[in-house]
């Protein structure tokens, strides 16, 4: 047994011990824990650790540079409250939510339109972002009898990765790694299956730049390219936590909804890939604007500058 394996095992044991405590938390206790944790991350933790400056830059990029420091700090505090609650709810999800009690916790907006698309016989790509409760959104469709392939990054710790894999697959889904899972996804979609993907990660210099909160954001082309190849229907959705009323409720309450349905066979544009990418990015932005505190502002969404992409093009042109 290597030192690394020992570390992974210790991490897993500590996680399972913490999970046992977390699973027993009530809504009121979760809110108190989240607010305390958010205060620590905002006011005590080193800003390099809390990625405070990244979140601050992103929030100002999205909502205007004229926001005061106090307003930005309030946004960041509320974001951390959400993220800590998200971690707790993700761990509690397998025990707290099932088909018998889901009506108590979930409101499904535009359900009829989504079910109609799912029954169309065509592949459906469910697109979302690091927003709201993305784990719950996907799990709900599995409970309703619509399993899909879920694309996610594999965790470094194999024991933790296996725990999360089982948690995600217990409602009938199939987990595919972002690296090396294409063959499985291809087989699933060609058989008429559905995929769930997060679409708000920076794609580097080779991505397609589209407007996201009024600023160019590098976005992966592969989503639009796959959708065009398979003639897939895109459903841009979300799952947001609703206000706690009352705090004594059995569990938190959520709204799952469809922001936009995009039929890729109906796209008429000079650059179909960019048009599709812009449309689903704009739809995601609209949903985030309604609950900005539930977005993951600490990730580098605008990491790649469009000027970097142009430099790459110039270099490739000279090399040719």
Describe each model-derived feature in a short phrase.
Residues 100-106, 153, 170-176, 213-214, ...:
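Short, flexible loop segments at the rims of nucleotide/cofactor-binding pockets, characterized by
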Residues 13, 51, 106, 177, ...:
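Soluble or luminal CAZymes and related metallo-dependent hydrolases
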Residues 2-7, 65, 69-77, 116-120, ...:
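Non-catalytic C-terminal accessory region of glycerolipid acyltransferases
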């Amino acid at each position: 047994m290597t030192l690394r394996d020992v570390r992974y095992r210790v991490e897993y044991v500590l996680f399972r011990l913490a999970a046992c405590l977390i699973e027993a938390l009530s809504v009121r206790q979760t809110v108190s824990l989240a607010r305390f944790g958010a205060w620590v991350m905002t006011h005590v933790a080193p800003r390099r650790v809390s990625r405070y400056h990244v979140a601050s830059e992103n929030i100002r990029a999205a909502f205007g540079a004229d926001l005061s420091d106090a307003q930005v700090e309030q946004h960041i505090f509320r974001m951390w409250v959400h993220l800590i609650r998200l971690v707790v709810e993700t761990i509690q999800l397998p025990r707290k939510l099932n088909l018998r009690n889901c009506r108590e916790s979930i409101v499904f907006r535009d359900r009829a339109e989504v079910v109609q698309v799912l029954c169309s016989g065509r592949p459906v790509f469910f697109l979302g972002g690091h927003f709201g409760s993305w784990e719950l959104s996907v799990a709900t469709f599995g409970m309703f009898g619509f399993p899909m392939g879920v694309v996610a990054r594999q965790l470094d710790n194999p024991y933790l990765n296996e725990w999360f894999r089982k948690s995600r697959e217990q409602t009938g889904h199939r987990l595919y790694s972002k690296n090396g899972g294409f063959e499985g996804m291809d087989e699933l979609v060609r058989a008429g299956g559905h995929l769930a993907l997060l679409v708000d990660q920076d794609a580097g210099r080779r991505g397609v730049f589209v407007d996201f909160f009024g600023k160019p954001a590098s976005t992966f082309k592969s989503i639009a390219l796959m959708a065009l190849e398979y003639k897939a229907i895109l459903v841009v959705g979300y799952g947001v936590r609703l206000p706690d009323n009352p705090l004594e409720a059995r569990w938190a309450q959520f709204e799952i909804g469809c922001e936009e349905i995009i039929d890729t066979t109906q796209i008429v544009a000079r650059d179909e890939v960019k048009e599709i990418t812009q449309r689903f990015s704009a739809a995601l932005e609209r949903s985030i604007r309604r609950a900005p505190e539930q977005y993951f502002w600490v990730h580098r969404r605008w990491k790649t500058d469009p000027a970097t992409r142009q430099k790459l093009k110039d270099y490739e042109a000279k090399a040719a």
